């Protein structure tokens, strides 16, 4: 038994909980007053974002494109031109001897060979004509780019209207530019400064194409990055980078209305490579390399995935250079894309693959 004395029975009152009416549940509207203590939300820093110094360094690596000056006849052009003429003579003499020999054997064989030779000659002439038209179209885009830049610099309304009319002609077969062309058609009789007209045409006609071009460059860079990360041989990486870059150059040229042929594509690829060589190209700054393979990303990217990011950035550089070459107007009203626009997506893509592993 317990030594404590049991408590005597006592009566006490229970407090009833206050009943809240439905009317009192509705809060009265707060009177307007100044609020000084606001809750501050500090966003977390993204490890893939570039610092100001790194972004400036990337901008230096991506200068704007300037069309090269036309050069005269070089020794290499004279050599290949002379060799081409000699090969044409050799093929003509061989074809003539073949047709004569077939006529000597049987007339129907000779006439058949002559007909086949005529068909081949007509097809060859059509191919040459198509290539010449494509080269002329590519040259007209380059001249239009220079004329638009000159008109915007001098604020020449007549030259600007001429350049805008040429741009509308090039973009006539592109469905994405229909709305912009209609807007410019409605402003035909309006008085607009030359510089503003160039900027307006660039915004209304080329902005949808720039958006799609960025998507093409980003997707090509992602494909190169993924293939590099999973390919077993370096030769496969190089081959796929060349294939994807060539396809990207052709697709960008077709997007902006260039439609290059075989020789036009070769000339266009040479211009892109020359642009890359002049601008310091594939090289990247030390701070960007440190961000890709060192510090916070070292724990996220393996060596193979790091190579994928670098190859993807190289493809993006080629795509940006191709945009500079094939775009009818220089970047003025619209922001020119840079490596910084793609580096974050490529790094996130490869870090996600590494995390899934």
Curated annotation (Swiss-Prot):
Record flagged with keyword Ribosomal protein: no
Keywords of the record: Cell inner membrane, Cell membrane, Membrane, Transmembrane, Transmembrane helix
Membrane-protein topology: Multi-pass membrane protein
InterPro entries: DUF697, UPF0283
Listed Pfam families: DUF697
Membrane spanning residue stretches: 78-98, 109-129
Region described as Disordered: spans on this chain: 1-36
Ranges of biased composition (kind: Basic and acidic residues): 27-36
Compartments, record wording: Cell inner membrane
GO annotation, cellular component aspect: plasma membrane
The keyword Cell inner membrane belongs to this UniProt entry's keyword annotation: yes
Family label: Belongs to the UPF0283 family.
PANTHER family hit by this protein: UPF0283 MEMBRANE PROTEIN YCJF
Protein name (record): UPF0283 membrane protein BCAN_A1047
């Amino acid at each position: 038994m317990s030594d404590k004395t049991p408590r005597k029975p006592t009566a006490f009152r229970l407090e009833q909980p206050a009943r809240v009416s439905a009317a009192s549940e509705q809060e009265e509207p707060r009177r307007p007053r100044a609020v000084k203590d606001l809750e501050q939300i500090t966003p977390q820093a993204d490890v893939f974002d570039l610092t100001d110094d790194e972004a400036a360094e990337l901008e230096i690596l991506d200068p704007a494109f300037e069309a090269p000056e036309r050069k005269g006849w070089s020794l290499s052009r004279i050599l290949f031109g002379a060799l081409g003429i000699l090969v044409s003579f050799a093929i003509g003499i061989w074809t003539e001897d073949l047709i004569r020999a077939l006529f000597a054997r049987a007339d129907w064989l000779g006439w058949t060979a002559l007909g086949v030779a005529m068909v081949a000659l007509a097809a060859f002439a059509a191919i040459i004509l198509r290539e010449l038209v494509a080269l002329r179209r590519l040259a007209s885009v380059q001249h239009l780019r220079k004329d638009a830049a000159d008109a915007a610099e001098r604020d020449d309304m007549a030259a600007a209207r001429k350049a805008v009319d040429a741009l509308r002609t090039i973009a006539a077969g592109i469905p994405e530019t229909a709305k912009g062309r209609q807007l410019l058609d409605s402003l035909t009789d309006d008085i607009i400064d030359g510089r503003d007209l160039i900027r307006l045409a660039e915004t209304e006609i080329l902005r949808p194409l720039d958006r799609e071009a960025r998507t093409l460059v980003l997707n090509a860079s992602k494909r190169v990055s993924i293939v590099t990360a999973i390919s077993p041989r370096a030769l496969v990486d190089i081959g796929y980078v060349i294939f994807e870059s060539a396809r990207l150059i052709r697709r960008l040229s077709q997007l902006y209305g260039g439609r290059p042929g075989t020789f036009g594509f070769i000339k266009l690829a040479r211009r892109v490579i020359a642009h890359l060589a002049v601008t310091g190209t594939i090289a990247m700054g030390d701070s960007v390399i440190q961000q890709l393979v060192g510090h916070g990303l070292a724990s996220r990217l393996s060596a193979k995935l790091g190579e994928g990011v670098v190859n993807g950035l190289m493809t993006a550089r080629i795509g940006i250079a191709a945009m500079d070459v094939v775009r009818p107007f220089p970047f003025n009203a619209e922001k020119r894309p840079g490596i910084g626009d793609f580096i974050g997506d490529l790094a996130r893509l490869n870090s996600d693959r590494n995390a899934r592993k």
